[in-house]
From Swiss-Prot:
Annotated GO CC locations: cytosol
Protein name per its UniProtKB record: Argininosuccinate lyase
PANTHER family registered for this protein in UniProt: ARGININOSUCCINATE LYASE (PTHR43814:SF1)
Associated pathway: Amino-acid biosynthesis; L-arginine biosynthesis; L-arginine from L-ornithine and carbamoyl phosphate: step 3/3
EC number: 4.3.2.1
Superkingdom to which the source organism belongs: Bacteria
Pfam families xrefs: ASL_C2 (PF14698), Lyase_1 (PF00206)
Amino acid sequence: MSKLWGGRFTEEAEAWVEEFGASISFDQQLVNQDIKGSIAHVTMLAKQGIVTKEEAEKIKIGLQYLLEEAKQNKLHFSIEAEDIHLNIEKMLIEKIGEVGGKLHTGRSRNDQVATDMHLYLKEKVEHIIKATKQLQTVLVHQAENNIETIMPGYTHLQRAQPISFAHHILAYFWMLERDVNRYEDSLKRINISPLGAGALAGTTFPIDREYSAELLGFNGIYENSLDAVSDRDFILEFLSNSSMLMMHLSRFCEELILWSSQEFQFIEMSDQYATGSSIMPQKKNPDMAELIRGKTGRVYGNLFSLLTVMKGLPLAYNKDLQEDKEGMFDTVKTVEGCLHIMAGMLETMTVNKEKMGQAVTQDFSNATEIADYLANKGLPFRQAHEIVGKLVLHCTQKGIYLLDVPLETYKEMSPLFEEDLYEVLSPYEAVKRRNSAGGTGFEQIKNALEKAKGLTKEVIKN
């Protein structure tokens, strides 16, 4: 077939060259955005008198027909037409005649594709924000049910201090809240229109960029036409934000994987989110958590890939920019899927409160309580730290724990020890007393839950 841009050429490309250069296999995902952008563009052309109202109406009817066909997956795309833009224009001309060729007046594929991607990401980021909020509501629900569930808190994956399981869960709530904030802030840069920037220098036609931007729901326009068609920082920002979100999901999944093991037994995954072994009948594998952890690297790769594509590109458009889409599409699909799986996995998991409680009674995670006890009685903390270190050494040599040490032994270490010491050694009391702002104390957790509910109330309402 003859190309819509073929006037300059005397030879046709080989079929394999066409296939190599075509992007329709993946950019057809922009079909709805491409048609909606074209409807806004031709509406603006008619308003400005660049095309007649009759021509615009005919073009819009043709585009609306194609949009309905697209929604029903009835459009058939061809590699010969290269990309989504030329495929739609070709179909439009076939449907309404040569007047369809006027659609591209005052526009280039360069600003057209940028517009499509802005529209696409605006919609998808809003979906991801909503899905993240839904995951946060699951975290709130689990935290409410586990305020007084005591577990070890860890540093270096070694038991450190007793904490509330709700406190641990809410740590991820606040990480996700920052992810939501980053996505929301990015919408300010996504929600601007490149349409009308042309190939790179604008156009000689008296277009109204603000009007077409308004029709598409954008908050403004790019101020520089070169910038509008050549940068993909809005996609990079999306990929970066998604990488951080996936990092948070991956860290949580790593803990869920550990906690579901026989060595921990803190939780059990629902059968819906686990698989078995083809050879070992006893196995229950946390495959969904492992997949989320694994897919995090995939999202990182999409970010690094586009950064590498962009780093050496001169202004303005270069064909390299065709490589901006597949990673974006893949990241959207990956993030949406991971958020959905994560919410279901956390909602259906069983928490083994007894095992968590046992883990903080047969260890030394209450050692800091003794140091604080001595410091509260006026002993410098560093001296208190040394005394408790000797006590822990004594216990490990005797094969006992701090609760097993008789008061006489404590008094040999320091005369400041009294009978009330054993109260502070209780893991429950240790957690309860940590009532500083943002701490693991039960009252602080209740305060944090109220704030968290306030941030997710719209999701709960819907």
